[in-house]
Amino acid sequence: WPPVEDRPCCERCTACTLMLPDEANTCVCGDIVPKCHQGCSLCERVDTPSGYQCKSFEYYNCGTKCP
């Protein structure tokens, strides 16, 4: 799995796999963003001003707000 510092940030992970160690987990991010992060395999438009949500399980830094 990718090193933590190379992962996209996600303030609110809504679903995660249950693996050990924690770094091995992939999650679905509940954040609504202006543009999906690079590597998101399922990016969907949502009906809000800022626009998109990555709906696929990806490696994230959960609980971190993007700068």
UniProtKB/Swiss-Prot annotation:
**This protein's UniProt keywords:** Disulfide bond, Protease inhibitor, Serine protease inhibitor
Could you list the residue ranges that cross the membrane? Answer: none
The biological processes this protein is annotated with in GO are: negative regulation of endopeptidase activity
The molecular function GO annotations come to: serine-type endopeptidase inhibitor activity
What is the reported tissue distribution? Expressed in bulb (at protein level).
Q: What's a single GO CC term here?
A: extracellular region
Site for Reactive bond for trypsin, residues: L18, M19
Q: Say which domain of life the source belongs to.
A: Eukaryota
Disulfide bond entries: C9-C66, C10-C29, C13-C62, C16-C27, C36-C43, C40-C54
Similarity comment text for this entry: Belongs to the Bowman-Birk serine protease inhibitor family.
Q: Main role?
A: Serine protease inhibitor. Strongly inhibits trypsin (Ki = 4 nM) and elastase (Ki = 4.8 nM). Also inhibits chymotrypsin with a Ki of 22 nM. Does not inhibit bacterial subtilisin.
Q: Does the keyword Ion transport apply?
A: no
Q: Which SMART domains match?
A: BowB
- Protein name, entry field: Bowman-Birk type proteinase inhibitor A6
